[in-house]
Amino acid sequence: MGRTRENKATVISDVQELFQDAQMTVIIDYQGLTVAEITDLRNRLRPLGGTCKIAKNTLVRRALAGQEAWSPMEEFLTGTTAILVLKEDLGGAIKAYKKFQKDTKKTELRGGVLEGKSLTQADVEAIGDLPSKEQLMGQIAGGINALATKIALGIKEVPASVARGLQAHVDKE
């Protein structure tokens, strides 16, 4: 038995609601995955602000109607489609998916959409290779700390060099 009209409307509204808060979507082919593997993928994405949504392509197209920012996604909606909706840590979520893909070897990354622009598989993987927010903050803090250390050593070196010069003059006499 197929879905009822009310059930389809619920799925469409759920998908629209997911897209409202999303920064990026990644479209994958999930053919061959078991329910346990899909649950594993969802569990890997959840702590990073990601969601894995599986819905019929027709219902996703209806949910996309009137949403210009997500319209480029339609080109990827063929076959068995799962949509990874990423809200927070884009790089971390993509890394989690790539690790899942490496572990299962069953999914295929089709592409993605970011800020209304269609992304190829290479584009999505490049975003995944970017450092995370925490790593960037650590690099910035390390750079600031190194700069402060160099300034402190420079300030300390001026009186020390004067003292060495005076000591050399005293030793000479």
Curated annotation (Swiss-Prot):
Gene3D superfamilies: 3.30.70.1730, 6.10.250.290
Pfam families according to UniProt: Ribosomal_L10
Record organism: Synechocystis sp. (strain ATCC 27184 / PCC 6803 / Kazusa)
Family label: Belongs to the universal ribosomal protein uL10 family.
Gene Ontology BP term (one): translation
Keywords: Ribonucleoprotein, Ribosomal protein, RNA-binding, rRNA-binding
Alphabetical list of InterPro entries matching this protein: Ribosomal_uL10, Ribosomal_uL10-like_sf, Ribosomal_uL10_bac, Ribosomal_uL10_bac_type, Ribosomal_uL10_CS_bac
Signal peptide: none
Keyword Ribonucleoprotein: yes
GO MF annotation terms: large ribosomal subunit rRNA binding; structural constituent of ribosome
Cited NCBIfam families: PRK00099.1-1 (NF000955)
GO-annotated cellular components: cytosolic large ribosomal subunit
Gene name as annotated: rplJ
Described purpose of this protein according to its UniProt entry: Forms part of the ribosomal stalk, playing a central role in the interaction of the ribosome with GTP-bound translation factors.
Protein name, per record: Large ribosomal subunit protein uL10
Complexes and interactors: Part of the ribosomal stalk of the 50S ribosomal subunit. The N-terminus interacts with L11 and the large rRNA to form the base of the stalk. The C-terminus forms an elongated spine to which L12 dimers bind in a sequential fashion forming a multimeric L10(L12)X complex.
Domain of life where this protein originates: Bacteria
PANTHER family the UniProt entry points to: 39S RIBOSOMAL PROTEIN L10, MITOCHONDRIAL
HAMAP family listed in its UniProt record: Ribosomal_uL10
